[in-house]
């Protein structure tokens, strides 16, 4: 019988918190620099991003499952698990967190550009 690997098999809870906090802090800082017509607020493991003409994004630490959950007004909810290489992966779509953010930024910019043309 195959053993399904759980996040606990890969990292400790202490390392989970460190990596999740670093990821969300870095994302908050990146978006604070890039956002025009919006803001990012990170506290207590929750990152809230509001963008004019796009909507609200939420990123939350989920310590019980050792995940980061994301909610997008464009693409909906996602759950990211940490893997051995300390990279966050959406196991359902096999998409890395960094790739997901790149795609969301592209979609967000496209949506914002479309709103400005009207």
From Swiss-Prot:
Q: Molecular function (GO) terms listed?
A: 2 iron, 2 sulfur cluster binding; ferric iron binding; ferrous iron binding; ferroxidase activity; iron chaperone activity
Location(s) in or outside the cell: Mitosome
Question: Sorted alphabetically, which keywords does the UniProt record give?
Answer: Ion transport, Iron, Iron transport, Mitosome, Transport
* Major subcellular site: other
Output the InterPro entries linked to this UniProt entry.
Frataxin/CyaY, Frataxin/CyaY_sf
One GO process term, biological-process aspect: iron ion transport
Q: Which residues form a coiled coil?
A: none
| Pfam families hit by this protein | Frataxin_Cyay (PF01491)
Q: Which SMART domains match?
A: Frataxin_Cyay
Ion transport among keywords = yes
Q: Where does it sit, as one GO cellular component term?
A: mitosome
Does S-adenosyl-L-methionine show up as a keyword for this record?
no
- What family, per the record? Belongs to the frataxin family.
Q: What does this protein do?
A: Promotes the assembly and repair of iron-sulfur clusters by delivering Fe(2+) to proteins involved in these pathways.
PANTHER family, per the entry: FRATAXIN, FRATAXIN, MITOCHONDRIAL
Subunit comment for this entry?
Answer: Monomer.
What protein name is recorded for this chain?
Frataxin, mitosomal
Q: What is the lineage of its organism?
A: Eukaryota, Fungi, Fungi incertae sedis, Microsporidia, Unikaryonidae
State which gene encodes it: YFH1
């Amino acid at each position: 019988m195959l053993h399904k690997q759980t996040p606990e098999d890969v990292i400790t809870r202490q390392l989970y918190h460190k990596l999740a906090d670093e990821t969300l802090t870095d994302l908050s800082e990146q978006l604070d620099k890039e956002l025009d017509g919006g803001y990012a607020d990170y506290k207590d493991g929750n990152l809230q991003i509001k963008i004019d003409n796009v909507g609200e994004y939420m990123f939350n630490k989920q310590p019980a499952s050792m995940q980061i959950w994301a909610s997008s007004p464009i693409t909906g909810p996602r759950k990211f698990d940490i893997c051995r290489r300390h990279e966050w992966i959406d196991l359902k779509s096999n998409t890395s967190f960094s790739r997901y953010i790149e795609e969301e930024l592209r979609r967000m910019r496209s949506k914002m550009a479309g709103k400005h043309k009207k």
